[in-house]
């Protein structure tokens, strides 16, 4: 009887070891199996038309495969019971075939001819479709302001800009005046709110409206870094101190297409930043244990 129990114990122990060794990662206690891992490696090699790899390339391939499977598992868990339809999968595959100038239906046949399990490929297609749905949801919360558009165009130095600014020039160069100019700077908020009593005892104010390219080079550098209603530091010039306060910046001769291009660029940048944070947070909150030998 003891011998029989020993045999049973050994049998179950071996089974548990075999089952554990078949798991290469856990994602929130959802297993990724060795078969899934091998299928993903084979799929990546087939899609990249790779026949053989060096040990270093094999390590890199393993890292890519396990990462894609972990990301995939997290996305499936996030999506829950919601389904990706067969029509969506078919359309995604057709889109890949079109981009690669392949006849419809030939991609899965190609993978099968390379002994690749098509389920691994379809699983990745599903995860990419989920990712697209996530990005679509994030994009609805993204807005681009006119100020952001102007800043982006101005920073490119590709368009002529008309600038209106107020220049405060000290009446002398004493230490007392320098302190007064710094105090003035701290009080300058909006151009329209500047009162003469703020500066008349120690400085004068000049209003200039002109194309940025027509302004003296030193001031161009200062003005480029300032948004409307922003003020420069107090700087020294000849026998006086100056402060520049930008009131308005108007971009000249910008077409609708150019404006739309900037809007799309800024929108995509914001979506990308939101997506990166979304996926980073997803990883941080997850329990991930990789048991694949390094």
From Swiss-Prot:
It holds the Pfam family SurA_N_3. Keywords: Signal. Residues 1-18 form the signal peptide. PANTHER family: CHAPERONE SURA. This is Uncharacterized protein RBE_0210. It comes from Rickettsia bellii (strain RML369-C).
């Amino acid at each position: 009887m003891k011998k029989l129990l020993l045999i049973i114990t050994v049998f179950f122990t071996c089974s548990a070891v075999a089952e554990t060794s078949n798991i290469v990662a856990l994602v929130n206690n959802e297993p990724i199996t060795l078969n899934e891992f091998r299928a993903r490696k084979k799929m990546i090699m087939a899609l990249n038309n790779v026949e053989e790899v060096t040990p270093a390339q094999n390590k890199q391939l393993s890292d890519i495969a396990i990462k894609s499977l972990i990301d995939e598992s997290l996305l499936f868990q996030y999506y829950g019971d919601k389904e990706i339809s067969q029509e969506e999968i078919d359309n995604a595959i057709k889109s890949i075939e079109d981009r690669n100038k392949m006849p419809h239906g030939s991609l899965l046949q190609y993978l099968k001819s390379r002994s690749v399990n098509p389920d691994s490929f379809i699983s990745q297609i599903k995860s990419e479709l989920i990712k697209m749905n996530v990005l679509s949801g994030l994009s609805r919360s993204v807005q681009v302001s006119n100020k952001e558009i102007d800043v982006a165009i101005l920073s490119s130095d590709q368009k002529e800009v008309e600038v209106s600014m107020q220049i405060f020039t000290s009446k002398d160069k004493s230490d007392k005046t320098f302190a007064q100019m710094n105090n003035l700077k701290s009080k300058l908020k909006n151009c329209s709110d500047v009162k003469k009593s703020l500066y008349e005892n120690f400085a004068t104010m000049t209003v200039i409206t002109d194309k940025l390219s027509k302004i003296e080079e030193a001031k161009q550098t200062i003005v480029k870094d300032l948004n409307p209603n922003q003020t420069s530091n107090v700087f020294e010039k000849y026998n006086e101190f100056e402060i520049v306060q930008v009131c308005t910046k108007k971009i000249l001769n910008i077409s609708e297409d150019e404006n739309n291009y900037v809007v799309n660029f800024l929108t995509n940048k914001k979506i990308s930043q939101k997506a990166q944070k979304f996926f980073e947070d997803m990883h941080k909150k997850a329990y991930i244990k990789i048991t694949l030998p390094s």
